[in-house]
Amino acid sequence: MAKAVYVGVDSKARKMKKAYVGIAGKARKVKKMYIGVGGKARLCYSAELERYGMAAALSTTRYDMRAATVGKYALFAGGYISKSSFSYHVSSSVDAYNTSLTKSTPTELSCRRCGHAAASVGGYALFAGGASSYNLLGFYENLVSAVDAYDASLTRSAAHIIGAAVEIGGAAVGNYALFAGGTVYSQINKDNVTSDVLAYDPSLTFTTAP
């Protein structure tokens, strides 16, 4: 049974996204709405999230990936695949899911990445920094300076290179994707972390935040 309510607007049926009722002079959001059918209350509208089901599995089993969105896609990139006797196996795979939950596999990252960061800006999903390997002694190896940018067609390009850094944070605000902190050393500790904040605008122009 459909759990949606439609209203007529300009002779067209429009799906109602939000509903409010007045209580004590205040607008209160309706979470669920029921109608009577055969003497029973039947749900006809719900503003709550519902579990849809399972999407196709990732192309490879892995964990500690980074995720970002671009256009109609959610991208999951890099991360660890498994652990051996000496080190962790790191991935360069990218899996993309569209709004129908159909999976595709764009061009892989320019290198394997762990300890990297992701953020979206304009028409791009960015994956920055990290390292290509991590050993069981707690050391990152082969720190990465490259930034991979994926557009809404899932085409990969190279953004302005940052300094090689690992364990950085990524976030988006307004017209900027920010990458902050981390370390340029193989092993992170309180004495070698940085306070640098790097910013990209929608044209992938790079600047250092003041």
Annotate each predicted stretch with a short phrase:
Residues A2-G8, K12-R14, V21, I35-P210:
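Kelch-like beta-propeller repeat domains
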Residues K26-R28:
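Eukaryotic N-terminal intrinsically disordered, low-complexity segments enriched in Ser/Pro
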